[in-house]
Regions:
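Juxtamembrane helix-loop transition sites at the ends of transmembrane segments
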Residues: 28, 46, 51, 85-88
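Extended, hydrophobic alpha-helical segments
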Residues: 1-41
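C-terminal structural segments of small proteins and small subunits
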Residues: 54-89
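Short amphipathic alpha-helical patches
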Residues: 32, 40-48, 69-77
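Extended aliphatic helical segments
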Residues: 2, 33, 47-48, 63, ...
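Short, intrinsically disordered low-complexity segments
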Residues: 36-60
């Protein structure tokens, strides 16, 4: 499982980026944080798409991908509830 977090200033690019993540099966946890569980092939394709998007980023924009073991997660609060908790301690 991976957690993808992004900070993109341009509304149009941010909206397209969010839709692209959802198209690849990502589930929105918070406004700019997604969870994704998929095959290595799909993940590799997603990384290529993110690299394509990065060509349009400003120096202030960023995308961070966390490779996470779901057995080491804990979640608190009112985020989307999934089978596994989702907060790092």
């Amino acid at each position: 499982m991976v957690i993808i977090s992004y900070d993109i200033a341009d509304d149009k690019i941010r909206s397209r980026f969010s839709k692209m993540l959802q198209k690849h099966g990502a589930i929105r946890l918070q406004f700019s944080v997604y969870e994704l569980r998929n095959t290595k092939r799909i993940m590799d394709n997603l990384v290529v798409r993110i690299e394509d998007f990065s060509k349009h980023f400003t120096p202030a924009d960023s995308v961070i991908i966390f490779d996470v073991e779901s057995s080491h997660l804990t979640k608190y609060g009112n985020a989307i509830h999934r089978d596994q908790p989702i907060v790092y301690l």
